[in-house]
Amino acid sequence: MSESVHTNTSLWSKGMKAVIVAQFLSAFGDNALLFATLALLKAQFYPEWSQPILQMVFVGAYILFAPFVGQVADSFAKGRVMMFANGLKLLGAASICFGINPFLGYTLVGVGAAAYSPAKYGILGELTTGSKLVKANGLMEASTIAAILLGSVAGGVLADWHILVALAACALAYGGAVVANIYIPKLAAARPGQSWNLISMTRSFLNACTSLWRNGETRFSLVGTSLFWGAGVTLRFLLVLWVPVALGITDNATPTYLNAMVAIGIVVGAGAAAKLVTLETVSRCMPAGILIGVVVLIFSLQHELLPAYALLMLIGVLGGFFVVPLNALLQERGKKSVGAGNAIAVQNLGENSAMLLMLGIYSLAVMVGIPVVPIGIGFGALFALAITALWIWQRRH
C-alpha cells in the first residue's frame, strides 16, 4: 500500500506548532533528566565509568525496538504515537523520582524515546513537503537544541540545588509534552493494515535497512548522521570528566553550561543550513563535518573557560550545518521507498549503534585509566578522519 501524505502549505500551521512545542518539552525532559540522573549517580557514589552506561541502556532500547517502532509510527496517527511515547517517558522519570533503580527508570525513558523518534520526524513529511521540508527540519532541530540548551542547564542547576526537584521538573516537562500532543491533528495512518507478526516485522525492517543501504544517497545520509550523533553523545560525557580535570571545577552545572554552548551553536547552524543547503546541494555540509573533529581536538587542549565556551559554540554551529541537510535527505528519499517511519527507525538503529559503540569505547578508556585530555584529542582526530573518508566515498559514488 502506498504511503498517504497529508501536507499543509503553511510552515506554521496549527499542527506544526503543536509538534514543535511537544518536541521542545519532550527534549527538555530528556536532557534535564540526563544531568539530574548523573547527579544522582554521583550522590550515590557510582563509579565514573558507569556514567556512559546510563546512556548505553537508553540507546539499547532504541536498538532493541528498532524493527518495530517504524511500523508503529506508520500504522497509527503519528500524533497519538508521540503522545503514548511521552507517557512512557513520564512513567520512567516518575519511577526515578520514587526511588526505583535509575538505570531501570532511564531504560523506560529510552523505550519511550525509541517509539517517539520515527513519529516526530515522520510527521513532518505529512504536515509539509518539498522545499519546506528542509525548513521544517530546521525548526525541529532548532526546537530540539533550544530544549537541549535549557534542559541541560536546568538539570544541572536544579540538581546542584536539590536532586529530587530536578527529577520532578523532568516529569512535569514530559506531562506537558503529553498535553501538547493532544493538539496535533489526527492524520490518517501512512501505511495501515500491515502484519503485526514479530518475525514478519523484523524481516520487513531488515528489508527496509537493505533498501536504504543500497541507495547511495540514503546510505550516505545514514552514515553521516550516525557518526555525528554518536560523537555528540560521547562529547557530552567527555565534558563531565573533562571539566574538573582541565578547568578545576567540580559542580554539576558547569558541564551543562558548556553543553549549552553546543546547543546554541547548533540552532545557528541549523538555521544557516535551512537557508543555504537544499536536497540537491547536500554535499555542501561535508566540510563542516570535518571541521567538527578538528575543533574538538583543539578544544581538548584548553584550560580556560572562555575559549572552551567559544570552541564549543563553534562545534555546535558546524554540527547544525552538517546534520540538518542529511536528515532532510533521508526523510525525503526514505518516504518514497520504505515509508518515513521506517526510514527514521533505520536511521535510529544506525545512530544508536554508533552511540553504543562510541560510548562503550569511551567507557572502556575511562575504566583502564586513560586521561580524559588524550581521549578528547584522539576522539576529535578520529571523527575528522571518518567524515573525510565519507566525503571521499560520496564524491566517488
Curated annotation (Swiss-Prot):
The chain crosses the membrane at residues 18-38, 53-73, 91-111, 145-165, 167-187, 227-247, 257-277, 281-301, 305-325, 344-364, 367-387. It is a multi-pass membrane protein. CDD domains: MFS_MefA_like. Residues 39-52, 112-144, 188-226, 278-280, 326-343, 388-397 are cytoplasmic. It is found in: Cell inner membrane. Belongs to the major facilitator superfamily. LplT (TC 2.A.1.42) family. This is Lysophospholipid transporter LplT.
